[in-house]
Amino acid sequence: QKIKKILKNKNSNLVYGPERIVQSKSLIELPKLPQILACEKKSAFESSKKLFLKISKKIIKTSILEAELIKLYSNANRYINFAIANQLYTICHLNNLDFKRVRNIMQDGYARNLNLTNAGFTAGPCLVKDTMQLKYFTKNSFSLGSAAMKVNENIPNLIIDKLKKFNSYKSKKIGLLGLTFKGETDDTRDSLSIVLLNKLKKLNLKILQSDEYYKTKNGISKKELINKSDI
């Protein structure tokens, strides 16, 4: 609404096309995903539709607010689903159970549980940002999003907790394989691997790190890390 006020009487041909593709998969997903277009002027929609039909098979017209919420909901939905897995992983961790085993048995012959994803680091420049944007849009009443962030952001602490259960862990070489927020990218924004790395440094541990997409002066090869790491 603030942007609409700023642009009022300045550009009636403004069209908003929210981006919903997975990072590093744009050339694969752009031709497959429906393209949402939001605007107030019919002629602007028709001209933008003509453009996007060159790369998209389906065009869906919405209001600007609908388009923005669809984008935010898409990422918040994924972020919350990952938080469910991470919360269940946390419960297993606190009870000395193997979450992967529990999850596999849950899903064995039981199709209704197949939507439960693996646990793990959930971050990056989109999922967290859009979930928090919804929180601020709702004047901090998006409690589910806040709870999801609390769960997901705590996973590095659980790893530290598991590490401390190893005998003489302070004398071990700790290998951290992967520094970016996800695989096949050099993007470290909001990466929980970096959060974990900083926590390990504060413990004054011997740390080895490797990421084939994100090179640092302290980085070594994946093979060398695996060969030299104790944990």
What are the residue ranges of the model-derived segments?
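Structural/interface elements that position substrates and couple domains in central-metabolism enzymes
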Residues: 1-231
